[in-house]
Amino acid sequence: MIEILKDKRGSSPIFTAIIVLVFSLIISTVMYIAYVEIQTTVIRNAMKTGLANLAYTISEDTYTALRESDFEEYVAKLTGESAYRTKLENTYKGDIANSIDTSTSEYTVDSIRLSFTRDGMKIRYTCTCDVTFYVRLFGINMPATAKSVQVEGSHTAKYG
């Protein structure tokens, strides 16, 4: 192989072209993986921002619920299916949509979900979404990879 590369007569243009092509593909793959990681970080940061806004709303509502002595009812409303929970989910989805584009030609953010759990006087919330990345091949956007992004938060309801 080294003899072919040292050949001065020009008899190795196909071999050289293949090597250049392989290196180009490797560089393209590395750049695409870096792009996916960067975009995933951007989406995760947008989710964290939305989560901070959501945490403020939940904290404020928890304080009100504790003052009115119906914390158990509030937790049941938060962890079960209710209009209040739907309102929180829609607010969260709106915060994410205001921070980033949820659908572009490079990726789509789907299935934004919120789940709430109670651990003593602590309310935990988990936000999850699925991100599908696309590659344009021959004029058609093809799904290349899918990632699940998850962000968690909590606050302790100690206002006593």
Label the predicted regions:
Residues T41, E60-G160:
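Short, conserved structural patches
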Residues I2-A83:
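Alpha-helical assembly-interface signal, strongest on the long, hydrophobic N-terminal helix that forms
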